[in-house]
Design a protein with these regions (language model features):
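The Walker A (P-loop) glycine that initiates the GxxxxGKT/S ATP-binding motif of P-loop NTPases
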Residues: 8
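Conserved lysine of the Walker
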Residues: 14
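Post-Walker A helix-loop "phosphate-sensing" segment adjacent to the P-loop in P-loop NTPases
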Residues: 22-32
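Conserved nucleotide-sensing/catalytic segment adjacent to the nucleotide-binding pocket
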Residues: 32, 38-92
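Small-molecule kinase domains that catalyze NTP-dependent phosphoryl transfer to phosphate-bearing small molecules
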Residues: 130-163
């Protein structure tokens, strides 16, 4: 059971890297990618203790080859609206802001940090998701920076890449 976590600022290319790794690994193994966007409790509660608890449950279940039930957030309804049973796979890839936080590193994940400057990251996100979220994204950039500083995510990731 291999656990990978891809973290870094919004717009850095974490989802793209996760998709490439999943495609490569799935040729010979079972793989599941979990996107942090699906686990966040909206904009304001995204990087709090609920995410940490969910990640702890996910990583422990994965390493024990057990199932884990996870709540998924619906961004259109702005609430959690479904649960899914995550079954054991050979590889579990966690990707998104907060994916490589301390609880995941403690579980022995191979961790990747993708870096990007804030303005380029913002431009990429707005091109992908729409200009209507610019206000939320600017606040998100502050939240993610605080999270990264407190958690020392970048400093503790094994592999550092720049996009």
């Amino acid at each position: 059971m291999t656990l990978l976590a891809i973290d870094g600022p919004a717009g850095a290319g974490k989802t793209t890297l996760a998709a490439k790794l999943e495609a490569e690994f799935s040729a010979h193994s079972t793989v599941r990618t979990i996107h942090m966007d699906d686990l966040y409790d909206g904009w304001d509660g995204a990087l709090g203790s609920a995410l940490t608890q969910t990640l702890e449950e996910l990583t422990l279940a994965h390493l024990s080859a057990k199932e884990c039930t996870v709540k998924f957030f619906n961004w259109h309804l702005m609430k959690f609206d479904r649960e899914e049973v995550i079954t054991p796979t050979d590889y579990l890839i966690l990707e998104g802001v907060g994916a490589a936080q301390a609880v995941v590193r403690k579980a022995g994940a191979t961790t990747y940090w993708l870096d990007i400057d804030a303005e380029t990251g913002l431009k990429r996100v707005l091109a992908r998701d729409g200009a209507h979220i610019e206000k939320e994204m600017r606040q998100w950039q502050i939240q993610q920076s605080i999270h990264f500083d407190l958690d020392q995510t970048r400093e503790n990731c094994e592999f550092k890449l720049t996009s």
